[in-house]
């Protein structure tokens, strides 16, 4: 069976790998699996997209596929991924679909599905869609005549989502000057409206999409652009979103980057003090910084680690009924309010904490000391054998003894490439780089492609 779904939906180069033909089939078969086979004759489906030039092409094909199976489609236009997830639940739709490749460059695009509960698909649901794609089954329902349903536009959905985000905080942001970076993507209009409605004074970059400039030297993957603006414009802080609005990276008033670990710590600390943190637990991935875990320990907050990927964070949060989790990359999940990472929601919550505490962002982050981190990738013949390689395990043990508790080692196979990733955190940059290179040399010697 072909594998279409990755860790975050179906992705590829638009019109080459992710073609209109494939988008049509994803609409048809995805609509059947996730809505039509629930017994609904005309399942209600919401469709949103980011600002990529290929979005309208794929949107048209996807909607045609959905209508061909009998779906009633509401087109949301340009909106964030978490906006689609929220509206799918709020409007009691049977299915939500987002067309986006998130932080990827403009040639890429993707299609991801949300169930009626607002959560991404299970592995079983993805496999069922893939099975139908392989079969290309001609026997699925094909409504005709009066059974074919019109699609409609519901661009007001974005304002409904903004109104909801405003309702999640009890303070306005009057007197605060905030720099916003929309990555020329889904939040380009949403972010200025949201923070403007909350009475903040805003300075914006990355909010002029033209279909071709999404994520181009702006957004959460290029926070240095916003850092410069924050300092030059004397802002209180800055918020950088990614192309589809499910990530947030912040900038403090001094121009320092504040990553997902630091944001989780600040929000988790506030929630814990207000007795709002379920089981006093934060869910993160194995890539979170050692300083994050030490800071949580100092606050008496527990932590739980998952594999890399926000879907694994969400799975663990649902399993344990936890309400805060996320990744260093800026995917922050606040389960009390939404079912997926939400950059705008996270930004509003962070701004609210800054306003209520009266502390600057640099003061709030100072309570978490980040350990310098070094990452080395090694191309290998069989990445999955790294955990059983005796020489690699021995050098890891030796380095751990030398670090004496002031560091951390993570050696793991890449999820997408024939690589072993060696990550070391240590007390200094020099130590982190030296230890990472030492381990990587052994991985290369014993497992590398050249050997």
UniProtKB/Swiss-Prot annotation:
Free-text cofactor note: Binds 1 Mg(2+) ion per subunit.
Post-translation changes: Activated by phosphorylation.
- Quote the Pfam families the UniProt record gives: PGM_PMM_I, PGM_PMM_II, PGM_PMM_III, PGM_PMM_IV
GO biological process entries? carbohydrate metabolic process; peptidoglycan biosynthetic process; UDP-N-acetylglucosamine biosynthetic process
Report the Gene3D superfamilies cross-referenced here. Answer: Alpha-D-Glucose-1,6-Bisphosphate, subunit A, domain 3, Alpha-D-phosphohexomutase, C-terminal domain
Protein keywords: Isomerase, Magnesium, Metal-binding, Phosphoprotein
Protein's name according to its UniProt entry: Phosphoglucosamine mutase
Q: Which organism is it from?
A: Staphylococcus saprophyticus subsp. saprophyticus (strain ATCC 15305 / DSM 20229 / NCIMB 8711 / NCTC 7292 / S-41)
Taxonomic placement: Bacteria, Bacillati, Bacillota, Bacilli, Bacillales
């Amino acid at each position: 069976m072909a594998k279409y779904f990755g860790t975050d939906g179906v992705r590829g180069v638009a019109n080459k790998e992710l073609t209109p033909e494939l988008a049509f089939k994803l609409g048809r078969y995805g609509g059947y699996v996730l809505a039509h086979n629930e017994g609904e004759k005309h399942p209600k489906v919401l469709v949103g997209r980011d600002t990529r030039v290929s979005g309208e092409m794929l949107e048209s094909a996807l909607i045609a596929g959905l209508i061909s199976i009998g779906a009633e489609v509401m087109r949301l236009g340009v909106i964030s991924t978490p906006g689609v997830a929220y509206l799918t639940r709020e409007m009691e739709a049977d299915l939500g679909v987002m067309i986006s490749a998130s932080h990827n460059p403009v040639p890429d695009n993707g299609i991801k599905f949300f169930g009626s509960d607002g959560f991404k698909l299970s592995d079983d649901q993805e496999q069922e869609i893939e099975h139908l794609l392989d079969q290309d089954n001609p026997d699925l329902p094909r409504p005709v005549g009066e059974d074919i349903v019109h699609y409609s536009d519901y661009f007001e959905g974005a304002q409904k989502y903004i109104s909801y985000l405003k309702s999640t905080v009890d303070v306005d942001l009057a007197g605060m000057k905030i720099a916003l970076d929309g990555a020329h993507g889904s939040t380009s209009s949403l972010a200025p409206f949201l923070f403007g409605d909350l009475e903040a004074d805003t300075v914006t970059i990355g909010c002029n999409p033209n279909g071709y400039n999404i994520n181009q030297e702006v957004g959460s993957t290029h926070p240095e652009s916003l850092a410069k603006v924050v300092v030059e414009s004397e802002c209180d802080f800055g918020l950088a979103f990614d192309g589809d609005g499910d990530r947030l990276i912040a900038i403090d008033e001094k121009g320092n980057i504040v990553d997902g670990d630091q944001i989780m710590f600040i929000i988790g600390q506030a929630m814990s003090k207000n007795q709002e943190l379920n089981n006093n637990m934060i869910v993160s991935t194995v890539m979170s910084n050692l300083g994050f875990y030490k800071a949580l320990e100092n606050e008496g907050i527990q932590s739980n680690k998952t594999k890399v990927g926000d879907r694994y964070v969400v799975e663990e949060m649902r399993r344990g009924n936890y309400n805060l989790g996320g990744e260093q990359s800026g995917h922050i999940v606040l389960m009390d309010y939404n079912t997926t990472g939400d950059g705008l929601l996270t930004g509003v919550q962070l701004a609210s904490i800054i306003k209520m505490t009266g502390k600057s962002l640099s003061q709030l982050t100072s309570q978490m000391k980040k350990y310098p981190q070094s990452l080395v990738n090694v191309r290998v013949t069989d990445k999955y054998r790294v955990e059983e390689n005796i020489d690699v395990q021995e050098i890891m043990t030796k380095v751990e003894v030398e670090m004496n508790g002031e560091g951390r080692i993570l050696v793991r196979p890449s999820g997408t490439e024939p690589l072993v990733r060696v990550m070391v955190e240590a007390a200094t940059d020099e130590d982190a780089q030296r230890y990472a290179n030492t381990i990587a040399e052994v991985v290369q010697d014993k497992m590398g492609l050249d050997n």
